[in-house]
Amino acid sequence: MSLLHTFKETLKPCGSFPSSSSLRVSSTQELEPSRKPPKSSLSQQLLRLDDSYFLPSKHESKISKTQVEDFDHNEDDHKRNIKFDEEEVDEDDERSIEFGRPGLSRAEFDYSGPYEPLMLSSIGEIPIIHVPASINCRLLEHQREGVKFMYNLYKNNHGGILGDDMGLGKTIQTIAFLAAVYGKDGDAGESCLLESDKGPVLIICPSSIIHNWESEFSRWASFFKVSVYHGSNRDMILEKLKARGVEVLVTSFDTFRIQGPVLSGINWEIVIADEAHRLKNEKSKLYEACLEIKTKKRIGLTGTVMQNKISELFNLFEWVAPGSLGTREHFRDFYDEPLKLGQRATAPERFVQIADKRKQHLGSLLRKYMLRRTKEETIGHLMMGKEDNVVFCQMSQLQRRVYQRMIQLPEIQCLVNKDNPCACGSPLKQSECCRRIVPDGTIWSYLHRDNHDGCDSCPFCLVLPCLMKLQQISNHLELIKPNPKDEPEKQKKDAEFVSTVFGTDIDLLGGISASKSFMDLSDVKHCGKMRALEKLMASWISKGDKILLFSYSVRMLDILEKFLIRKGYSFARLDGSTPTNLRQSLVDDFNASPSKQVFLISTKAGGLGLNLVSANRVVIFDPNWNPSHDLQAQDRSFRYGQKRHVVVFRLLSAGSLEELVYTRQVYKQQLSNIAVAGKMETRYFEGVQDCKEFQGELFGISNLFRDLSDKLFTSDIVELHRDSNIDENKKRSLLETGVSEDEKEEEVMCSYKPEMEKPILKDLGIVYAHRNEDIINIGETTTSTSQRLNGDGNSADRKKKKRKGCSEEEDMSSSNREQKREKYKMLAEFKGMEILEFSRWVLSASPFDREKLLQDFLERVK
């Protein structure tokens, strides 16, 4: 049945589809069937830097992706417990965004499905619960399933999580569900609270998307009485609510954190938490306030159910469905610790087996309270796909020397040697004795300018400031120079610091003051990432690509802006200082204007809410400790309505702290895939999160400030573990799903051949590159239709290719494409049609007809 389900989902008709809060409707002609380029192996990484690799050939562009491709188918580092990679987004950052998700235009309200209600209640059940026809006719099939899921939660008087990927329409699914529960008629809209015994609905969301909720209600369900509890009119809205004049109340997380005692006293019928992952920290005041809400019908909406730690999963489910995952201690001992220990690279087989059993048990439990779908399994057949490349750029010689001086500073050496015995002969550690304070350090002296005896957290108070400096050096040396906007005392401290780390190179870098020279700032010679970016962009621009360029640093955006001006590129820019009323016009202009080549975006200000589907290249200039932030930035371009293949380039400075940032991202994403999706992941790392016994290569202060200049840290880890990708658990899974071990092993072996392109990559200033998809989630829980159709017949050929060392990558890629075409041709011949005629039939056929065709074909193959 899984095979039939895969075929059914991937070959859905691409006709007119309904819109949602983030789904745009296009006509059948606009959704011209196109083929997503085949996924390549790592050894073809250079080809991925060339656009010609991604664009389908003239012949292939006439065949849809569904016709060919879909057959194949945080941290406890020190006593102060600094959680730099797990902290919640500050409300100040939220305010800086103030930009809602894209709304829908009037032209996008064409009906695309049968104008009939969606029945939710069982036959004979009274009252009859249904989604109004005016809403149901615009829903996609996966959205209807989401509405049914939420209604089942509601009917059983408990909460749950709608964990769909960003861009799958969680907002409209929620509105459709509420319209059904409150008995709204899409045409008359007469039902109201005065005639109902139900209480009101509370929606809590980031302040940046409050307007979006208002807008979506007005477009999809204007019959609801919606009010916003935010700002100066709170008292008036509260009185209106008590008078039963409000059906839906929308407020921000920050407002609810402050006004929780007032709002928690109201008998809410349903509470919706949008971006529910904000409830990941059980010690936050927001989480404590949300626990006081009386109703059991709590629904969380989030595309990132788990971001940093498995314990976040418990916190979120403890809010939506208290007790569903047991006690906190039980969850930690039964799920959290075994899953992490079983993921160690050298974990004993017994630990791996226990982790696998606990993973399956947790998955079966989560499915009762969570529905999660990805773009690939829902609307993937309507999109051209995305490829996520991680590019390790060679730092300039000056950058490397400055980085080396930085890690030799007394502050960092104090942290690295904190556990060593003190030189004075005391039995205490250095950090508890003579090296608790660092009076000779520039950074320490500034932090403790008012207290020369240090603070209670010394020396661990130095961790975060030192990490920030290392990240700035990894991006651009100008970033560590004094900022003219800072206070004079801080500028003086920064000047002393710069003088120390620049050393004898100070004149080459223009002195210790911030440069005002346009030519100096726009020059790429002292920045490894900009040198690589210059060559990559030249290739993209020449081929008509449009680029999104993200950075967390506004100062870095200033430098990149000067670089773009110097190169003569036409660009737009959006950051926290961009007025809210101008942001949508900037987005619309970029999407509509072919002359706009680059969009410079602050990741904090534009990581959420922007719809930039005209861009097909996304550059993440600086990585974040939280992997979801980088993924959200990618989704500005990779969303419904994108008609081109999206290629993402994450730029990292090789041999720097950024490699550790990325490897921790990999670790966190793997944990999320294991705990949330029940997938199998390659065991790359020896480190175990929040475990001092197994800090390995990832965790602990010593790893943060390790010198990686003489090695390729990430590359070494990948190469070390490439031969262990198919462990015993994966072998069992592969055999169960009909894919041979040799077949899978050959695929993995052919994915790692970086030596072949090293000379050309070096010319681009790139030391190493790989595709993120090749590192994360190599082991799938299910296999594609084509893999099952293949059977074991080609095993001998694959063994032969493996013995040859996969030397002819280009021939293999061509062979794969031919195999896919041949399979599709076989289906067409079985149907008695030419390929183009069969393509039209696939797009117009009902799911039942397609399913029947596949059943008949499989019977014939057998």
From Swiss-Prot:
Its EC number is 3.6.4.-. It comes from Arabidopsis thaliana. Residues 274-294 form a coiled coil. This is Switch 2. Residues 782-793 have a biased composition (Polar residues). A motif (DEAH box) lies at residues 274-277. CDD domains: DEXHc_ERCC6L2, SF2_C_SNF. ATP binds at residues 164-171. GO terms for biological process: DNA repair. InterPro entries: Helicase_ATP-bd, Helicase_C-like, P-loop_NTPase, SNF2-like_sf, SNF2/RAD54-like_C, SNF2_N, SNF2_RAD54_helicase_repair. The keyword ATP-binding applies. It comes from the Eukaryota. Belongs to the SNF2/RAD54 helicase family.
